[in-house]
């Protein structure tokens, strides 16, 4: 159950937050680790919020200006790197003291991102594939073998809501920044679906409130 201390509109964000929490659990990441999150969409942002709450340093990679701004506003990442503007490998190695990251999360379904994560994860590190791919992907198996990487999949959540809710109740995660719009039920199609279809780079969670006037 969700306590009365969490507003109902924020409670609606618990479900996608639990997706991020489950990915964190699958990774085995520990406090003090450095994580590389590939992609700053809704799941990438919420996953990063969980990682930060768990004392993990977060490096996020993202190309979209709007998504970079949302990551900055919500404070979920310690570093936000745009591969089109900087040398990603050089910057990550600088941050990690040439060691590579402890764990990496793929949240884009883009093969180039997956390749970067495999390249920049340290030996014996973990790469977690969070996004659902609708097309075949390739992975540099030679790098996986030579660095003894663990490549893991994760899907949705498995009995993670209790721990996820606790993070919010304890004030370790503020869900308000992830509510990008509140709309009336009558505006579900004209404002909700239209924004998700045509301007989804700026949308994280759109709340439909039948009581709005």
Predicted regions and their residues:
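Glycine-rich cofactor phosphate-binding loops and adjacent beta1-alpha1 units
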Residues: 27-29, 59, 69, 74-150, ...
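Short glycine/proline- and acidic residue-enriched helix-loop micro-motifs
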Residues: 3-9, 174-179
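Residue-level signal for nonpolar/aromatic packing positions in well-ordered secondary structure
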Residues: 2, 20, 51, 71, ...
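Mid-domain Rossmann-like dinucleotide-binding core that forms the NAD(H)/NADP(H) cofactor-binding site
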Residues: 4-85
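Residue-level signal for the nucleotide or nucleotide-sugar donor/cofactor binding architecture
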Residues: 15, 108, 156-159, 183
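Conserved acidic E/D residue at the C-terminus of a beta-strand in Rossmann-like folds
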Residues: 62, 131, 155
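C-terminal hydrophobic helical "lid"/dimerization subdomain
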Residues: 115-119, 158, 162-213
